[in-house]
């Protein structure tokens, strides 16, 4: 499924439910939109008794995955059946008063993060918001539910991948970019989640958690913005399946879109001399295309051969052959 989802992706996982699951999904959604925080969806019509429980559990998970604005929903749910009526119970993590207070802060935070994007092309809107979120948040796992929903990122400026993802999805949808949550694994963190967004109709992978600035450089890398499935699979895996859009385009990848790819040492020297001058910027993002060469060694060699003076610090993303060069003036 790679077509652009309706409602900016807000009912994406609903589309994979069977009829009974969709009925339960709609029932839960109607209650939550009416600010019913009882944590009980009663009188759910049962069409197929044999799959009633699993369908309702799937519906609840789909609601949570589709709607990061429902940050107050807990993880587990409980289903009971009386005849052809089902009752789904789920935990509400906060009181109604706290929910309303957090909702106000969420609206305020999202407005701040998307400010100034209205007149920009879609991809420039995306880049600006992505960078702001990456700079705003720090990765911290406090062992609390706030790390996994919007509360940690909005109130404390930190969280884990689910928190990062929730804020990114809310902001993307606010600026008109369809997006959905994707689950998978990584080589370093085990289970992980990130975003698939549709840029000009094409689905791409975005992992803002992995683009958090490192403490040394303090600069957003954009390594994981708008990747194809092939590109992100160098260190993300077990994310393929019928529910995950087929992301094949690489033309919106940050480095390609910005014209930051170099194919030889000569090109590398030219780009460094052109962009790392005293009168221009002091940092340079590059994708070094020759896979057989070590980017770190190539940059060091190119700097020595160039007409630049001073010193540089070099940061590499070996998996994607990306280089961040910071010139110390």
What name fits each language-model region?
Residues 28, 155-159, 183-186:
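Alpha-helix capping and helix-loop boundary segments enriched in small/acidic/polar residues
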Residues 88-89, 152-156, 202-208:
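Short, well-ordered strand-loop elements centered on a beta-strand within folded domains, enriched
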Residues 150-164:
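A short, highly charged nucleic-acid-interacting micro-segment common to nuclease
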Residues 160, 168, 312-316:
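Structured core of small recognition/catalytic domains
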Residues 1-120, 231-329:
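N-terminal accessory/pre-domain segments preceding catalytic cores
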Residues 96-153:
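Secondary-structure boundary elements
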Residues 163-231:
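Hydrophobic/aromatic-rich core segments of domains that either
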Residues 55-58, 62, 101, 105-108, ...:
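Extracytoplasmic/secreted proteins, especially bacterial periplasmic and envelope-associated proteins
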């Amino acid at each position: 499924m790679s077509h652009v989802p309706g409602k900016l992706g807000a009912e994406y996982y609903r589309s994979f439910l069977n009829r009974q699951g969709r009925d339960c999904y709609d029932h839960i959604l109607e209650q939550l939109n009416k600010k019913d925080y009882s944590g009980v969806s009663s009188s759910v019509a049962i069409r197929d008794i044999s799959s009633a429980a699993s369908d309702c559990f799937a519906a609840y998970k789909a609601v949570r995955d589709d709607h990061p604005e429902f940050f107050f929903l807990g993880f587990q749910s409980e289903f009971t059946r009386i005849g052809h009526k089902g009752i789904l119970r789920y935990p509400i993590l906060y009181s109604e008063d706290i929910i309303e207070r957090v909702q106000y802060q969420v609206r305020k935070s999202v407005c701040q993060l998307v400010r100034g994007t209205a007149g920009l092309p879609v991809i420039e809107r995306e880049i600006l918001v992505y960078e702001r979120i990456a700079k705003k948040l720090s990765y911290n796992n406090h062992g609390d539910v706030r790390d996994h929903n919007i509360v940690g990122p909005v109130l404390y400026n930190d969280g884990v991948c689910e928190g990062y993802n929730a804020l990114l999805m809310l902001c993307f949808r606010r600026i008109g970019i369809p997006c959905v949550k994707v689950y998978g694994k990584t080589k370093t963190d085990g289970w992980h989640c990130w975003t698939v967004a549709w840029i000009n109709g094409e689905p791409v992978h975005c992992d803002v958690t992995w683009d958090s600035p490192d403490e040394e450089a303090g600069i957003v890398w954009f390594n994981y913005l708008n990747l194809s499935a092939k590109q992100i699979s160098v260190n993300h895996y077990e994310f393929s399946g019928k529910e995950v859009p087929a992301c094949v385009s690489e033309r919106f990848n940050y480095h390609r879109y910005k014209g930051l790819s170099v194919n030889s040492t000569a090109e590398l020297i030219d780009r460094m001399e052109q962009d790392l001058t005293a009168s221009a910027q002091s940092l340079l993002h590059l994708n070094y295309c020759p896979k057989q060469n070590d980017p770190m060694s190539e940059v060091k060699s190119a700097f020595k051969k160039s007409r630049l003076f001073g010193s540089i610090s070099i940061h590499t993303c070996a998996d994607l052959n990306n280089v961040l060069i910071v010139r110390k003036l």
